[in-house]
Amino acid sequence: LDQMERAGAIVGNALVAVKNAAKPGVSLLELNAVAESVIRDAGAIPTFLGYGGFPASICASRNDVVVHGIPTSEEVLEEGDYISIDCGATLNGWVGDSAWSFGIGKDGALQGDELPDDPESSAGGSLRSLDKATQDVLAAGIRAMVPGARLTDVSHALEMATRDAEK
């Protein structure tokens, strides 16, 4: 368990560094380099790099890219973008993997109470709804994780919360 925790901590550190570097004008490939540096400096290897031919250390999905976006130098962050970064690190055979989604710039603050009040703003409306739905689904899954629960119990709670969010 200690090895798993260390791998997860490396991923957490990489995601913090990526979030801190994610500003308007920064390319997704630059964010990839930040994550890879943190991972390698910690003595781990980027899990995604080369897996099934994947060419990067992170998946970077900007705005309407749903999942597993490939970071490029041509794709540059802009004020108000919404980005998801998926990151993995392998340490001594153990894998840490996590994904964070967040907004870019002052109009991109999409974390909890920082969401813009104006639903017509570039970072409001549907992104506000997505952020809330994601938090609600996560909370439902965590509540279902009790001693004796089966994986199907947790997945059922996630499914029901997702269906509620779609209404």
Segments and roles (model prediction):
Residues L1-K167:
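Active-site neighborhoods and metal-handling regions in enzymes and metal-associated proteins
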